[in-house]
Amino acid sequence: MSLITVENLSVRYGANTVLRNVALTVEPGEIVTIVGPNGSGKTSLLKAIIGAARPAAGQVTLRPGLRIGYVPQRLHIDATLPITVERFMGLTARVTREDCMAALKIAAVPDLLKRQMSQLSGGQFQRVLLARALINKPDVLLLDEATQGLDQPGSAAFYRQIEDVRRETGCAVLMISHELHVVMSASDRVICLNGHVCCAGTPAVVASAPEYRALFGTGTGGALALYRHDHDHNHDHDHEAAE
């Protein structure tokens, strides 16, 4: 059974329809990236999946018992608030130090447990958010522009870490990004969204799709130069451009 199934989903805010007739699935262990221009409905789609936005039509079905880890687009913490990484990770649920350490290790920042949140660099902060999302051993990670504010090397390092997380934990990943040249290389499937699904498939299929090039131009073809994903598992998702 698919982890997440979205069927004919439409989302409206007042009279404004931001998503219409969107359909997609997320299968166990795969990395799916949603790309699209600003205002294309990417964040609204994630909100509908986690129940933070009510569909105007269609439905979202989660596999029974599905555990979701969520890494938000941004999170502001008052710099004057004295809070350690360990305390931050236990704010919303009771967790042991061992759980914190295990999650931080998977996120490749095992030495930050006692560090003040206000002292973290941008990259360290995002990895702590990743560790917090991993602490309950999710079946799927949802990432909403999780590298916003990082420079290109920092973003690339973060997405490489996401691949490592998938290999180590087996969890699926559904992520939103505008950094096409980086995330293309880390994805099993790419879904191009602009209020509806323009095209979907492997990075190679999507990068050559007319719908994708109409939105992003031909210059993004360089994304495929980074397409170094070497699978040790199979997904039957080389599907054609969607209407």
Swiss-Prot record:
The complex is composed of two ATP-binding proteins (ZnuC), two transmembrane proteins (ZnuB) and a solute-binding protein (ZnuA). This is Zinc import ATP-binding protein ZnuC. Keywords: ATP-binding, Cell inner membrane, Cell membrane, Ion transport, Membrane, Nucleotide-binding, Translocase, Transport, Zinc, Zinc transport. It catalyses: Zn(2+)(out) + ATP(in) + H2O(in) = Zn(2+)(in) + ADP(in) + phosphate(in) + H(+)(in). It is found in: Cell inner membrane. Its EC number is 7.2.2.20. It comes from Jannaschia sp. (strain CCS1). Pfam families: ABC_tran. SMART domains: AAA. GO terms for cellular component: plasma membrane. SUPFAM superfamilies: P-loop containing nucleoside triphosphate hydrolases. Part of the ABC transporter complex ZnuABC involved in zinc import. Responsible for energy coupling to the transport system. One of its GO terms (molecular function) is ATP binding. Belongs to the ABC transporter superfamily. Zinc importer (TC 3.A.1.15.5) family. The keyword Transport applies. InterPro entries: AAA+_ATPase, ABC_transporter-like_ATP-bd, ABC_transporter-like_CS, Metal_Ion_Import_ABC, P-loop_NTPase. It is an enzyme of class 7 (translocase). Residues 4-219 form the ABC transporter domain. ATP binds at residues 36-43.
